[in-house]
UniProtKB/Swiss-Prot annotation:
S-S pairs: 26-41, 33-46, 40-61
Keyword Disulfide bond attributed: yes
Listed name of the protein: Alpha-actitoxin-Ms11a-2
Keywords of the record: Acetylcholine receptor inhibiting toxin, Cleavage on pair of basic residues, Disulfide bond, Knottin, Nematocyst, Neurotoxin, Postsynaptic neurotoxin, Secreted, Signal, Toxin
Keyword Signal: yes
Residues annotated as signal peptide: 1-24
UniProt note: domains: The presence of a 'disulfide through disulfide knot' structurally defines this protein as a knottin.
Function: Alpha-toxins act on postsynaptic membranes, they bind to the nicotinic acetylcholine receptors (nAChR) and thus inhibit them. This toxin competes with alpha-bungarotoxin for binding to orthosteric sites on muscle-type T.carlifornicus (IC(50)=1080 nM) and human alpha-7/CHRNA7 nAChRs (IC(50)=14.13 uM).
Organism of this sequence: Metridium senile
GO cellular component: extracellular region; host cell postsynaptic membrane; nematocyst
Localization annotation: Secreted; Nematocyst
Domain of life: Eukaryota
Length: 66
């Protein structure tokens, strides 16, 4: 049981080192985001960039148009 808890903690520490933005509370410009989570920082919105083929797979935080 203790080894399972240790493993979960180790995975969490590795993830927080690799993906600091996901633990900062909000996502910065051009960070990957999920539209329904509203996780981009103030002034940014989660949009799917259009790469010409009309199918941008990754959603990113971009500046909101005024």
């Amino acid at each position: 049981m203790a080894s399972k808890i240790f493993f979960v903690l180790a995975v969490f520490l590795v993830m927080s080192a690799v993906l600091p933005e996901s633990f900062a509370g909000c996502k910065n410009l051009n960070s990957h985001c999920y539209r329904q989570h509203r996780e981009c920082c103030h002034g940014l919105v989660c949009r799917r960039p259009n790469y010409g083929n009309g199918r941008g797979i990754l959603w990113k935080c971009v500046r909101a148009k005024k």
